[in-house]
Amino acid sequence: MPKTLTEKLNAIKAAGKGIFVPYIMAGDHEKGLDGLGETIHFLEDLGVSAIEVGIPFSDPVADGPVIEEAGLRSLAHGTSTQALVETLKTIETEIPLVIMTYFNPLFQYGVENFVKDLADTAVKGLIIPDLPHEHANFVEPFLADTDIALIPLVSLTTGIERQKELIEGAEGFVYAVAINGVTGKSGNYRADLDKHLAQLHQVADIPVLTGFGVSSQADLERFNAVSDGVIVGSKIVKALHQGEPIQDFIKQAVAYQK
């Protein structure tokens, strides 16, 4: 039986709507982790498809400056993986949450304990950007009997046979990395990006979402046209931190019709 995240996103896709997943950094709030539920419910009320929740880490190799600084602010507020897990247990939401964490915090906590402790929460997906596919066996056995999907990240420079290998048996969605580089680096797109996304669609039987560098209305339109939806991180994180209005951008993303 498909996992909840797969079913939820497939239903949005089947309805002819674009999938929209904002990223937030846990603990990057004036109230620290006490403000996490407030942010999640703010986004839920705007109708987002799912929410990616980042765990702060001192060496975030895939993150650009906006998210790296958010992580440092979160750590300064005293955020820990243990405290985040305890906070997630208290948050009630109908929106699937997807945890984005580097492997080190997960390893320090204990993969099996982490998965068990999140079993009764809204967490339905897990992204580990620095975990090679060849080492997925460090995590996958603990997820097998849970409702948490391990999300594959696929570079659009990856050949089709490798793409098939990366997404075989995957649930939730495929995270298509739109740029070569770190998050938030807008506009540095390959000339053949659309062709690579079309190729990825041919081999994926779950939704394909585009992320890394998606930050403008033009980006939303472009990537919704060639993938099943988008993930937006740096723009959301910056707006929430600086108190900038972000509602209209999110509403436009949520309302996108295929």
UniProtKB/Swiss-Prot annotation:
Its UniProt pathway annotation is:
Amino-acid biosynthesis; L-tryptophan biosynthesis; L-tryptophan from chorismate: step 5/5
Carries keyword Lyase? yes
Arranged from A to Z, the UniProt key words for this protein are: Amino-acid biosynthesis, Aromatic amino acid biosynthesis, Lyase, Tryptophan biosynthesis
What GO MF annotations does this protein's record show? Answer: tryptophan synthase activity
What reaction is this protein's catalytic activity?
Answer: (1S,2R)-1-C-(indol-3-yl)glycerol 3-phosphate + L-serine = D-glyceraldehyde 3-phosphate + L-tryptophan + H2O
Q: Does the keyword Lyase apply?
A: yes
**GO CC terms of this entry:** cytosol
Q: What class of enzyme is it?
A: lyase
Catalytic site positions:
E52 (proton acceptor), D63 (proton acceptor)
What is the annotated quaternary arrangement, including any partners? Tetramer of two alpha and two beta chains.
Q: Which family does it belong to?
A: Belongs to the TrpA family.
Give the protein's function: The alpha subunit is responsible for the aldol cleavage of indoleglycerol phosphate to indole and glyceraldehyde 3-phosphate.
Protein name (database record): Tryptophan synthase alpha chain
Task: Give the species.
Answer: Streptococcus pneumoniae (strain JJA)
List the top taxonomic levels of the source. Answer: Bacteria, Bacillati, Bacillota, Bacilli, Lactobacillales
